[in-house]
Amino acid sequence: MFHATTIVAVKKGESVAIAGDGQVTFSQNMIMKSTAKKVRKLYNGKVLVGFAGSVADAITLCEKFEEKLEQNSGNLQKSVVELAKEWRQDKVLRRLEALMVVADKDHLFVVSGSGEVVEPDDNIAAIGSGGPYALAAARALLQSTDLSAAEIARKALEIAASICVYTNNNITVLEL
């Protein structure tokens, strides 16, 4: 499990949102930064990505993923499969410790270095140390409220931050 971050993504109707907290924890016991941006828009603002794990590793993977998107003309499904395959097989990349959540208006995926590419059945994904809390909160909010995808993502992350010591309330939300 990766400490020091929480990312949650929610797809609802024609909208998709991803939210990330801003905490960077060093050596599992010291907050180094509280305003980090762990969610981004890629491919001319058409793809959302959030990452958990080692910062340098996550940035490297984000750059690799952006290359795949360019090579595949923005085809998210093909790009994540190619990234996961390369991530698992490449001697350098397979040592990277990170997880990614990626989404466009049609798909939402969790991608890992062990080759997993998972598209959740309920259109909600959460990773990082606060991921289980954010996932549970997002599911409850999706089922019991009329909130938008962005509002659900923000509230789910706020709930996770109130429980997980590796997650803070400095939340960035991006939406398509």
UniProtKB/Swiss-Prot annotation:
PROSITE patterns: PROTEASOME_BETA_2. Gene3D superfamilies: Glutamine Phosphoribosylpyrophosphate, subunit 1, domain 1. The active site is at T5. Its EC number is 3.4.25.2. It catalyses: ATP-dependent cleavage of peptide bonds with broad specificity. Na(+) binds at A161, C164, T167. The keyword DNA repair does not apply. GO terms for molecular function: metal ion binding; threonine-type endopeptidase activity. Keywords: Allosteric enzyme, Cytoplasm, Hydrolase, Metal-binding, Protease, Sodium, Threonine protease. A double ring-shaped homohexamer of HslV is capped on each side by a ring-shaped HslU homohexamer. The assembly of the HslU/HslV complex is dependent on binding of ATP. Belongs to the peptidase T1B family. HslV subfamily. This is ATP-dependent protease subunit HslV. It comes from Caldicellulosiruptor bescii (strain ATCC BAA-1888 / DSM 6725 / KCTC 15123 / Z-1320). The gene is hslV.
